[in-house]
Amino acid sequence: MYGRYINITYKCLVYMKNNPKKLDELDNRLLKELVKNSKRSYRTLAKDIGMSTTAIIERVRSLEDSGYITGYGCRVDYQKLGFEFMAIVEISIFGKDLLQIEGKVARIPHVAAVWDTTGNYDAIAIIMCKTRGELSATVKKILSISGVEKTNTNMVLNVVTRLTEFEEV
């Protein structure tokens, strides 16, 4: 009996992930508030939005089950931690193993993010280092990966906004 229940639950979750619910104005407002500060209690969130705590909990769970909310985190000031050198590295890749090569880049220490892109370069990596030497070594490690044709490194002067601060919901 339990096996059948688990199987039905799994199928429902898979269906919900593949067929997400349509968002209404309240869902959008809730997402916007959670992007601003996901650490708030459900009670505070309910008060700010003007709904009951139970309704907020149900909506958040529904957004999680539908795949709109994929996790929670915090924003860290990496400069305060000593990461003074941030760079955007554009990567040109030859061959058919694009995703494998991007995966290798992602596993290199100091690589904070890797995006598969279109345009003049096949991928973009964000690198965060404490010293110029670490940055140089990281770019050289990327270039040493078989399949990486060339890179173009852009030093970040100032971070004006972060991707986690994008609130257009």
PLM regions: where:
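A compositional/biophysical signature of low hydrophobicity enriched in polar/charged and small residues
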Residues: 1-169
